[in-house]
Amino acid sequence: MIGRLRGVLIEKQAPEVLIDVNGVGYELQMPLTSFYELPELNQPTTVYTHFVVREDAQLLYGFITKQERSLFRLLIKANGVGPKLALTILSGMTASEFVGCVERDDIVTLVKLPGVGKKTAERLLVEMRDKLKSLMEASVGSEREFVLQSNYSPAPVVNSAEEDAISALISLGYKPPQASKAVSAAFKEGMDSETLIKAALKSML
C-alpha cells in the first residue's frame, strides 16, 4: 500500500500528475480541487494517496489532505460509485460543497455532475449522511478540515489552454460538445488552462 508520496512535481496536466520520488516517477490522478493546490513544476510537494489494483492496471489517486482522501474512500464504498466517478465528484465540487449537498439533500446539484443520475444521487445522500458526520467529527482540529482554501497561483499561459481544458473535462466524463461549449463560454483572454477548467466546471453546476 502506498499511502503518501513526497517528491518533486515534474509534470501536471489535469487531472494527471507525475511526481519524482528519489528517481522514480509516480503517475497519479487527482481531483481538480486538489490539482489546483499543487505547486509549480520542479517544486517539492507531498500528496496522500489511494492505491487501486485492477486486473489490467495499478492506479494511484492523489490528494492534498488526508480528509480529502478519506472522503474519496467513503465515496468508492457507496453503491454504484467507483474510483472514476468519485474523482469526477470531487473534481466538480469541493469536499465542503459535497458535504453541504448531503446535509441539504441537494439532488439537483449532484445530478449535474457527469455520471451521477438521480438514483445514484439519492443513494449517495442516504449512504453518505451518517458516514460524513463521523468523518467531519474526526477532522475537527485539522488545519483545514473540509474547507479548501486554495493557495494556487496560475502558471504562465501555455499554448492551447482551451484544448487542455476541453481534454480535462472529457477525461472527467463530460461529452466533447458539452466540454467544448463550457470552455468556450468561460474563456477569457490571458486564462491559463487550470483557471479555465475551474471556470468551465463552475458554469456547469
Swiss-Prot record:
GO molecular function (one): ATP binding
Pfam families cross-referenced by the UniProt entry: HHH_5, RuvA_C, RuvA_N
Record carries keyword Nucleus: no
SMART domains xref list: HhH1
Record flagged with keyword Cytoplasm: yes
Residues covered by region (Domain III): 157-205
Region of interest called Flexible linker, as start-end residue ranges on this chain: 144-156
Chain positions covered by the region annotation Domain I: 1-64
SUPFAM superfamilies for this protein: DNA helicase RuvA subunit, C-terminal domain, Nucleic acid-binding proteins, RuvA domain 2-like
Sorted UniProt keywords: Cytoplasm, DNA damage, DNA recombination, DNA repair, DNA-binding
Region (Domain II): 65-143
GO biological process: DNA recombination; DNA repair; SOS response
Localization per record: Cytoplasm
GO cellular component: cytoplasm; Holliday junction helicase complex; Holliday junction resolvase complex
Gene3D superfamilies noted in UniProt: 5' to 3' exonuclease, C-terminal subdomain, DNA helicase RuvA subunit, C-terminal domain, Nucleic acid-binding proteins
Disulphides: none
InterPro entries: DNA_helicase_Holl-junc_RuvA_I, Hlx-hairpin-Hlx_DNA-bd_motif, NA-bd_OB-fold, RuvA, RuvA_2-like, RuvA_C, RuvA_C_sf
CDD domains given in the database record: UBA_RuvA_C (cd14332)
Coarse class of the protein's main subcellular location: cytoplasm
Stated family: Belongs to the RuvA family.
Domain writeup: Has three domains with a flexible linker between the domains II and III and assumes an 'L' shape. Domain III is highly mobile and contacts RuvB.
Biological role: The RuvA-RuvB-RuvC complex processes Holliday junction (HJ) DNA during genetic recombination and DNA repair, while the RuvA-RuvB complex plays an important role in the rescue of blocked DNA replication forks via replication fork reversal (RFR). RuvA specifically binds to HJ cruciform DNA, conferring on it an open structure. The RuvB hexamer acts as an ATP-dependent pump, pulling dsDNA into and through the RuvAB complex. HJ branch migration allows RuvC to scan DNA until it finds its consensus sequence, where it cleaves and resolves the cruciform DNA.
Subunit structure: Homotetramer. Forms an RuvA(8)-RuvB(12)-Holliday junction (HJ) complex. HJ DNA is sandwiched between 2 RuvA tetramers; dsDNA enters through RuvA and exits via RuvB. An RuvB hexamer assembles on each DNA strand where it exits the tetramer. Each RuvB hexamer is contacted by two RuvA subunits (via domain III) on 2 adjacent RuvB subunits; this complex drives branch migration. In the full resolvosome a probable DNA-RuvA(4)-RuvB(12)-RuvC(2) complex forms which resolves the HJ.
Designated name of the protein: Holliday junction branch migration complex subunit RuvA
Organism: Shewanella oneidensis (strain ATCC 700550 / JCM 31522 / CIP 106686 / LMG 19005 / NCIMB 14063 / MR-1)
Gene label: ruvA
